[in-house]
Amino acid sequence: LAELSGFGISATGQIDTKEGVVSGTAGHIANWIQTPIAQIFKDSYHLPVSVVNDADCALMGECWLGAARGYRDVVMVTIGTGIGGGILTEGRLLTGVRGIAGELGHFPIRADGELCSCGNRGCYEKYASTTALVNMVRDRADELVPDISADHIDGQLIFNRVSQGDTALRSVVSEWITSITLGLVGLIHIFNPQLVLIGGGVSQQEDLFIEPLRKQIFSYTMPGFCKDLIIKSAQLGNNAGLLGAVAYLKNLF
């Protein structure tokens, strides 16, 4: 412990970064709200502690040592079981008044949409997450993948079949990409970033996902916002959050 200067913690949920406390979970994790993460570590180790949302940490990691290095205005969206993300503006992490800004999975894109775990309807992650894509295929499993049981359908299987020329699945993926696009275009029009960074396992599908997404984004975005706009995949994978937690502790962002 003598060599430690502090603890940088990447945590899931809505994190009050000022207090180091979990302030919300969007209905995902029982008994996590109001956990005083920072105080627990301070009481045990008597060292500085910072606690930040895991998606915000991923953004800071990528800005420090990854695909977003050198950029000062960045929107990052992580696509997986849900949707996470973070926003860097003029080189600083956007945290909001209580440190919980950037809950990108839970802005509604459909007023009469599906019920979300957060209690709202039509949330972005209900249509733009990998879970959403899997559910789209499962709902039509008898038609789209009659040789596979619904329980065995996942994102990897879907993209493998699209890469092998499955046009029906490609159409479903295109519809899903449009949902992702609509949310990202809104964020681009609000924040005017230099870079939109896409994280999550699906981000490694350059030809089947990133390139079609890029084309759709530029087709929907107003021309002035497209100037110098870059859209690309994150680089650091699961290490991004760990590196970002250290970066925040070191006051780099």
At which residue positions do the language-model features occur?
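Short glycine-rich anion-binding loops that position phosphate/pyrophosphate groups of nucleotides
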Residues: 12-15, 80-82, 202
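Active-site-adjacent loop/helix segments that line or gate small-molecule/cofactor pockets in enzymes
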Residues: 55-59
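General beta-strand structural signal in soluble alpha/beta enzymes
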Residues: 49-53
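Structural signature of FAD isoalloxazine-binding scaffolds in flavoprotein oxidoreductases
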Residues: 100-103
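Active-site glycine-centered loops adjacent to acidic/histidine catalytic or metal-binding residues
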Residues: 54, 80, 245
